[in-house]
């Protein structure tokens, strides 16, 4: 019965944005895509911004496998240096992941995303095990800054075309992306979790 209740709640969930296509999106700039999604949620008042989190996925080696990505929609994973998604923990106790690069539903119920896109660390070599820096959306909007220099090669050419809007910066910084990618709990904002800790903290099954 609990499973039926969760499914019913998920089916009644109203997404925080109209469609995937309505979101601001630039390939390979996932950190900015999610910042823009946080900004959209803040200005449209459908959900409290405090219910939403930016989630950076990386590890010490900057090699994290994620399945069901548009860059490789077959059975194999994409190995990213880092990836960023949005987590919404609704007042009804359901959690949803917004991943603009997945072939899974958008948004995707948390537990489905974990099962299909992240799978388990048990069968993954330790160097590939994922960690998660979870930052409240309001803090992310206030503190994140990027001058996009990480997307230029040694000759100063763009590896991927940058977004058309100006770089995101704060009064204190023009570039602090590495503080968000870092999985050192002593650095940056938010809290850092292992996969099992992340699931235990945010899984809809725990409500």
UniProtKB/Swiss-Prot annotation:
The active site is at residues 30, 83, 99. GO terms for cellular component: cytosol; nucleus. GO terms for molecular function: protein-N-terminal asparagine amidohydrolase activity; protein-N-terminal glutamine amidohydrolase activity. Its EC number is 3.5.1.122. It is found in: Cytoplasm, Cytosol; Nucleus. Disulfide bonds: none annotated. Gene3D superfamilies: Protein N-terminal glutamine amidohydrolase, alpha beta roll. One of its GO terms (biological process) is protein modification process. Keywords: Cytoplasm, Hydrolase, Nucleus. Coiled coil: none annotated. Signal peptide: none annotated. It catalyses: N-terminal L-glutaminyl-[protein] + H2O = N-terminal L-glutamyl-[protein] + NH4(+). Monomer. Belongs to the NTAQ1 family. Mediates the side-chain deamidation of N-terminal glutamine residues to glutamate, an important step in N-end rule pathway of protein degradation. Conversion of the resulting N-terminal glutamine to glutamate renders the protein susceptible to arginylation, polyubiquitination and degradation as specified by the N-end rule. Does not act on substrates with internal or C-terminal glutamine and does not act on non-glutamine residues in any position. Does not deaminate acetylated N-terminal glutamine. This is Protein N-terminal glutamine amidohydrolase. The gene is Ntaq1.
